[in-house]
């Protein structure tokens, strides 16, 4: 059972006890992502995520790494467009130490100028690595087409230009604005004890909101259709196509997930079978849904040799047109629902996945559903609901990004 406790300062502690395991996973979830940055701040959320590992008042970066290695634990973090998470997984008897180190990083990082300069180079290498990978770059460019005037269209990693402006002062100013108690969830799952929960409250329950804190506002940006093309000397052309879709708050979310599953979400999907299995046009072809607090997107990606790009694109369009015209089949919907239920339940067998699900649900929805409730909602997905989504999503003008040799 998931329990939620709100500290006196507004920090929420979400706990799920799983007594038969010998581990705990804990994550600090912050409602701060790249979409809440100004153009000048682009990339700072991700840069802060890096800098929290670079040393505190009492621990060096090396000591942080060594302490987790010494106990056989794992520590990591990620930044998305809407949130940031710092998380760890350790044996249950090391839970208090793991929480203490995470809290030390969270509250006591020093943002040393020398470390800032070194990590700036590390993130720049990360940016260059992403730009060198056309399968990454094409998705980044696609978001720029979809939302050219909104932070959703900017890269999470930032740019060389914005990175060069970040200092300890700008970092602290951003933290003051967004790392406020009511914007933070500490999620923990596993063999959790009452003493460990009290330890979390002691560490996170008393820090105060900065007077400079701001409320994150959603912009509900307009989706833009259009096309981006980049010429590159590569063996394969990379194609990404995106349609405007629904938000994570939409009650039709499960219908959308089922639609994605049928169109390109697995090996038996329409796109995989037609593009890869029947015609041998691509090794990689898939679709996925991106759902945020106010907007969403349905995206298709495929890569093929440069001479076959137009054939692959025509095949994708033909497949989508058949879905639009004929709808889906009963067996496809049945299989999609069973696959969704199976992947959901199997994914809940680890402490990391439970911690992540609970933290994300609390931060985004402020509520939690049991496994049975989720399965029941998946069972309610119907042909009419999915076909309605087909008519509202797949009939819109898409955004397109292409990277390859001789593309146009």
Region annotations inferred by a language model:
Residues 1-23:
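N- or domain-start disorder-to-order transition segments that initiate the globular core
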Residues 6, 17, 63-212, 229, ...:
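Charge-rich, well-structured scaffold segments of protease-associated domains
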Residues 20, 25-89, 265-281:
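M16/MPP (pitrilysin/insulinase) zinc-metallopeptidase core fold and M16-derived inactive scaffolds
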Residues 27-29, 212-269, 402-403:
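His/Glu-based metal-binding/catalytic segments typifying zinc-dependent metallopeptidases
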Residues 36-43, 250-259, 263, 267, ...:
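Short alpha-helix boundary/capping segments
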């Amino acid at each position: 059972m998931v329990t939620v406790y709100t500290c006196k300062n507004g920090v929420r502690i979400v706990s799920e006890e799983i007594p038969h395991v010998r581990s705990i996973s804990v994550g600090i979830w912050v409602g701060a992502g790249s979409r809440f940055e100004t153009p000048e701040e682009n990339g700072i959320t991700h840069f802060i995520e890096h800098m929290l590992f670079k040393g505190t008042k009492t621990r060096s970066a090396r000591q942080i790494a060594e302490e987790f290695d010494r106990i056989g634990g794992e520590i990591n973090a990620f930044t998305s467009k809407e949130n940031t998470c710092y998380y760890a997984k350790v044996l249950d008897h090391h839970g208090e130490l793991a929480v203490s180190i995470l809290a030390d990083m969270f509250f006591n990082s020093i943002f040393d100028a020398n470390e800032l300069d070194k990590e700036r180079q590390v993130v720049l290498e990360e940016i260059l690595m992403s730009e060198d990978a056309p399968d990454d770059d094409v998705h980044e460019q696609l978001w720029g087409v979809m939302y050219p005037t909104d932070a959703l269209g900017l890269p999470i990693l930032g740019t060389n230009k914005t990175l060069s402006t970040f200092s300890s002062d700008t970092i602290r100013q951003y933290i003051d604005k967004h790392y406020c108690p009511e914007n933070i969830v500490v999620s923990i799952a596993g063999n959790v004890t009452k003493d460990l929960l009290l330890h979390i409250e002691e560490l996170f329950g008393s820090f105060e909101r900065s007077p400079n804190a701001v409320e994150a506002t959603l912009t509900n940006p307009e989706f833009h259709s259009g096309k981006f093309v980049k010429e590159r000397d590569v063996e394969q052309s990379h194609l990404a196509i995106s349609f405007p879709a629904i938000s994570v708050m939409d009650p039709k979310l499960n219908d959308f997930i089922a639609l994605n599953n049928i169109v390109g979400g697995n090996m038996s999907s329409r796109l995989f079978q037609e593009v890869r299995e029947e015609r041998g046009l691509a090794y990689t072809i898939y679709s996925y849904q991106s759902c945020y607090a106010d907007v969403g997107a349905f995206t298709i990606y495929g890569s093929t040799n440069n001479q076959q790009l137009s054939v692959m694109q025509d095949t994708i369009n033909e497949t989508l047109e058949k879905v639009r015209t004929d709808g889906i089949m009963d067996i496809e919907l049945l299989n999609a629902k069973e696959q969704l239920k199976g992947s959901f339940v199997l994914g809940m067998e680890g402490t990391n996945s439970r911690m992540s699900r609970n933290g994300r649900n609390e931060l985004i929805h402020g509520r939690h559903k049991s496994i049975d409730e989720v399965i029941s909602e998946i069972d309610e997905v119907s042909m009419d609901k999915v076909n309605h989504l087909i008519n509202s999503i797949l009939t819109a003008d898409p955004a397109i990004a292409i990277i390859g040799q001789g593309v146009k």
